Curated annotation (Swiss-Prot):
Keywords: Ribonucleoprotein, Ribosomal protein, RNA-binding, rRNA-binding. This is Small ribosomal subunit protein uS3. One of its GO terms (biological process) is translation. Binds the lower part of the 30S subunit head. Binds mRNA in the 70S ribosome, positioning it for translation. Residues 39-107 form the KH type-2 domain. GO terms for molecular function: mRNA binding; rRNA binding; structural constituent of ribosome. SMART domains: KH. It comes from the Bacteria. Belongs to the universal ribosomal protein uS3 family.
C-alpha cells in the first residue's frame, strides 16, 4: 500500500515556504521556536471567532513581525483598533523582541483548506450530518475556483459504535505532482461520542515557477486583499 505524504512538507522550498521565517544563532533556536509555538497557540485560543487560517512569524533584527491571515479581520482589530492594540501588548510580553502586527484578510474562505476543515469540525460539533457538511464544503470550493477538493472524516461518525473513515472528492487532486498548488489542513471535532478528525486537500492549479513564495503571492492575488499594518 502507498502512503500519503504531507502535501505541505513535500512542497517546501518548491512552491511554498515555512510559516516561521527566521534564522537563529547558537542556542537561541530552541527559545525562539518555543516562542513561536506559544504565540500561535495564544492567538488561536484568544480569537476563535476570527476564522484564522495561519499565523506567519518573521524575525528581522530585534523585531517579531506577526502576520495573521483571517477571514474576519474586524474581530481582531475591534472598534477603532482598540482590540488589536491590546493583543499587541499581550504578545509583546511573550517575546523579548518588539512586536509588529499585520492583518491579512482572506476574502475567499471557501478555498482555504484550514478554514474549510475548521468549518466542517464546527458543524460536526453541532450534530450536522457529516456527509452533508462534506458535500456542501466541496461544492462551495469548486464554485469559487478550486479545481479539485478531497475531504476525509474519521471517527465515530454519526454516533456509530465502530469508528470508520469516510471521504468525498470532486475534481482532480494530484498528491505527488510537485508543481501542483495543493492546500492541505487538518482539524478536530470534539463531539459527544469522541474526537473526529477532518483532513482537507484543495487543488488550486499548477505553479510552473520554482519559487518558495509563489503560493503566498498567488493567495494574496486570489483573495484581492491588502495587508493592514498596525504599527
Amino acid at each position: 500500500m502507498g502512503h500519503k505524504s504531507n502535501p505541505i512538507g513535500m512542497r517546501l522550498q518548491i512552491n511554498r515556504t515555512w510559516d516561521s521565517r527566521w534564522f537563529a544563532q547558537g542556542g537561541d533556536y530552541g527559545q525562539l521556536l518555543l516562542e513561536d509555538i506559544k504565540i500561535r497557540k495564544f492567538i488561536m485560543k484568544t480569537l476563535p471567532q476570527a476564522a484564522i487560517s495561519k499565523v506567519v512569524i518573521e524575525r528581522p533584527a530585534k523585531l517579531c513581525r506577526i502576520s495573521i491571515y483571517a477571514a474576519r479581520p474586524g474581530v481582531i482589530i475591534g472598534k477603532k483598533g482598540a482590540d488589536i492594540e491590546k493583543l499587541r501588548k499581550k504578545l509583546d510580553s511573550m517575546t523579548e523582541s518588539g512586536v509588529s502586527l499585520n492583518i491579512v484578510e482572506i476574502r475567499k474562505p471557501e478555498i482555504d483548506a484550514q478554514l474549510v476543515a475548521q468549518g466542517i469540525a464546527d458543524q460536526l460539533e453541532r450534530r450536522v450530518a457529516f456527509r452533508r457538511a462534506m458535500k456542501r464544503a466541496v461544492q462551495s470550493a469548486l464554485r469559487l475556483g478550486a479545481q479539485g477538493v478531497r475531504i476525509t472524516c474519521g471517527g465515530r461518525l454519526g454516533g456509530a459504535e465502530i469508528a470508520r473513515t469516510e471521504w468525498y472528492r470532486e475534481g482532480r487532486v494530484p498528491l505527488h505532482t510537485l508543481r501542483a498548488n495543493v492546500d492541505y489542513a487538518e482539524a478536530e471535532a470534539h463531539t459527544a461520542y469522541g474526537v473526529c478528525g477532518i483532513k482537507v486537500w484543495i487543488f488550486k492549479g499548477e505553479i510552473m515557477a520554482h519559487d518558495p513564495l509563489a503560493q503566498d503571492r498567488l493567495m494574496v492575488e486570489a483573495q484581492t486583499s491588502g495587508v493592514r499594518p498596525t504599527r
